[in-house]
Amino acid sequence: MSSGDSNPAATPTPGVDTQGDGRWMSLHNHFVSNSKGKEPDVLFVGDSLVQLLHQFEVWRDLFSPLHALNFGVGGDATQHVLWRLSNGELAHISPKVVVLWVGTNNHGHTAEQICGGIMAIVQLIKDKLPKAYTLVLGFLKLICNIQVSVKLQVQCRTQGELETRSTPTDTMTDCVTVRGGGERV
């Protein structure tokens, strides 16, 4: 993609109201309102993979004690997360860690575009929450196209390393444990 081209995956765009009931915007407004007065140690942001974490024991056992907030929305792609974070979801909180897991729903976008969208989200988080550690989780292997999944991981790892090499607050991982200071287990 040339520098003059617009990347749809990195252009903040409200989510599509597929149910026709305003659910997406209502959920966004709930996140903005719910974050006021909260002091989360961890913020999870992303699509349905993040949203569904509430249903698992690991959330209750590990993340609830950290006063974690879950800003996952089913169906969201990178451009939707970028819009939500640009429009108030980060305004009232200062988490120590932001966990980002998104990209699965970027149908029709190239690996380069999806990577650009993820990097735009990481940059926005850095700008709005400069003290937060950002953890970008790896991608699930897309059943329909394993080659695209692998290319996406390689592209984002390469671009991410080039763009954030001097910043110790960002890590992309395939679900390895990352401790404070960047130590990987």
Where are the regions a protein language model picked out?
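A Trp-anchored, charged/polar loop motif used as the substrate-binding/catalytic surface
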Residues: 26-30, 34, 76-88
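Alpha-helical cap/lid subdomain in secreted, periplasmic
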Residues: 60-69, 76, 85-185
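Short active-site-adjacent helix-start/loop capping segments
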Residues: 51-54, 77-80, 108
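N-terminal secretory targeting modules
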Residues: 1-45, 49-61, 174-176
